[in-house]
Amino acid sequence: MRSNKINNVDLFTSAANDNFNKHIKTQSKQALEIINKKINWTKLLKPIEEIITKTKQNNSPAGRRTFDLLVIVKCFILQSIYDLSDPRLEEEIADRRSFQIFLGLNSSDSIPDETTICRYRELFASLELDKELFYEFNKQLTELNFIVGKGTIVDATIKQAQAKPSSNRDKDADFTKKRGKTYYGYKGHIAIDSETEVIKKVEFSSAKIHDSNMFNSLIDETEQVVLADKGYANQQRKRNLRSKGIFCGILDKGYRNRELSRKQKKKNRLLSSVRNAVERPFSFMKQVLNYSRCSYYDIRRNRFEFIMCAFVYNIRRLITLTT
């Protein structure tokens, strides 16, 4: 018989895979209660509210039916955890008291409809408020010493586009090749803290952008160690890191006429055992959040989706590290 007590390491697995059955609903309720307690919402949202207030845009929700920004951001979190479309989220908020409690709504309060959720997503994507949200939360993690900054591990993942290449519906997606296979879509780039596995930085691009092009924007150049796979191998890059006193843990790359030495292979194996930690956020996004491909047809909204998944992953790390 399964216990109702949540194993915090698997908290999001329990919540995201709840299938809306009665037993797991109890775990989901507990999961949402823990999230509510762990985050300083006022501090998180203040800079975002200031940006929205200062920005005068034709597509702003102002003047239409509006909701507290806290409710909207929590709606985005629910969508990421439970893999819900806008219409399905509206239905579940109306049906599930645990969702209403998480959002701070009474049973008599109006709930955000699918149009409202969509409008706010457009606002966040157009103003890059998803990035602001992510980095404001990371400030809280830094204050808690969960972003240590001694070591950084960099990697990227390919996300298949929602549109087919032949449809020409997605103007931002593009092609790339990996291990001889062609992909059409985007890339999500991350840098994690090597000690806590918290995602420190995020970038999002079309798939044609080489992983290494995002390298400089993902590192701080104040860390002691940087690790990355051989796709980032570049002699000038290695020299730059070493000149700053940073240990270069970029895996060596072999070439057709210059294979790796035994020493280099051994070094790669040792570095890989540490570097592999960067695969865990991507695995979490795919296996737990069911984020296996893009949902939208442009880079702004697909970036928003990726960064929200990274944000939820960091919430999960906060809970795991503080329990």
Name each region found by the language model.
Residues Q224-V225, K230-R300:
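Helix-centered, glycine/charged polyanion-binding patches within enzymatic domains
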Residues P61-L70, G180, Y297-F304:
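Structural motif
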Residues M1-K46, L321:
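Charged, often Cys/His-bearing segments associated with DNA-binding zinc-finger transcription factors
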Residues L32-I77, I81:
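Basic, short loop/linker segments at the boundary and entry of helix-turn-helix/winged-helix-like folds
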Residues R97-S107:
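Short, basic interhelical loop/turn and adjoining N-cap
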Residues P87, E91-A94, G104, P112-F247, ...:
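Polybasic low-complexity intrinsically disordered regions
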Residues R300-N302, I307-T323:
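Charge-patterned, long linear interaction tracts outside catalytic cores
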